[in-house]
C-alpha cells in the first residue's frame, strides 16, 4: 500500500520536475550608424558575421550595413566596448606594444590561438572605453547629420581624429563634400538637390593615403508638389537660353569656395514680416502649360513691395546687381561652399565685396525678373547644388557645423 502511494505521488510530482522547453529569445534591433560594418558588429556583439548576414539578408552579400536602417541581432547578443584597429603591416605584437596590452591577452580576446601567427589584415579589438566601430584610419568618431537622409537637404558628416586631422576628402554618390578642419575635428557638407534619386548611395571617405572607407547611407522618399505657372508680359519672353546663360555665369561664382565657415550664429529668415510662404523648395514646375522639367530652387516669401530684405548670417557679398532672369539680385558667400541668394528685389542696398552681419539690409522685396508678383525668392546652395533653406533652419545645420569644429553658435535674433 505504501509503495502504491509512493508511485502515485511520484507520478504527480514528476511532470513538474521535467523542465519546460526554453523559449527562443526574440531578436534585438539595432539602428546602423557610421562604422557599423559586419566585422565591427560581430566583434561588438559577439556574433559571427555569417549569422548576422543570415538574419539580415541582402542580394549583395559583400555590401556593408546601410546607415540609417534597422537590422536584427540575435536575442543573446551581448555588447562589449573597445577600439577596433585594422592590423595592416605592424602585426599583433606591434599593436600590443603600442596599446600597452599583454600579448597573449590580446590574442585571446580576439579569438587567436597564437599571437605569433599572421593575422592577414584581420581587424583587432584593444581594450578601451567607447563603442566598437570600423572607421576610416586615424578617425576616432564619425556621425551624420540625418539618418535616414532626405533628397534636397543639406547633409553633413563630422568627427574627430586621434591627432591632427589627416588629409581628408570624400563624396556621396560622386557629389564631393566640402571639408573644414580645426585641430583634431572635421566637418564635411554636401547637397543633393531635389532630383536626387536617393535609395542607398555610398558615402566614401578618404583619409590620408589609406584605402577609401565606404558605407551606404539610406535615403527616405520625399513628397513634392506640382505647380502650373502662367507667365505674361516681359516674364513670358525669358527663354531657356537666357536662363542657361545667366546660370553659367553664377556657377563660376558658386565654384569659388571659401574653406572656412564665415558665420557665427543661426541663420535667420531674411524677411521679418511676410504674408505667406507662397512656394516651397523642390516644387515641380510647369510654365505656360509646358512639361515639368524643373523644380523650384528656393523658398518664396510673399510680401509687400519695399519690405526690407536682410542678411540671415555673416558672409561676404559676391554679387549685387540686376539680372535678366532673377531680377534684382544679391548673393552672399557664407564659407564652406555655402551660398545664399536673394532675387526679384525692387531695390539693392548691398555692394559686391561688402562683409555683412545678420540683420544688415540687402535690398527690398519686389517683382523684377521672372516673377508673377511681389515676393522674395531665397535660395541656399552647397557646392553649387540647391538645398532647402527652410529645412536648413529646422535642422539647425548652421550650429551643427560650428559645433562639429568646436566653435560656439549664437542663437539670438539681431534687433530689427
What spans do the regions from the language model cover?
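Short, well-structured beta-strand-loop connectors
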Residues: 308-318, 350-365
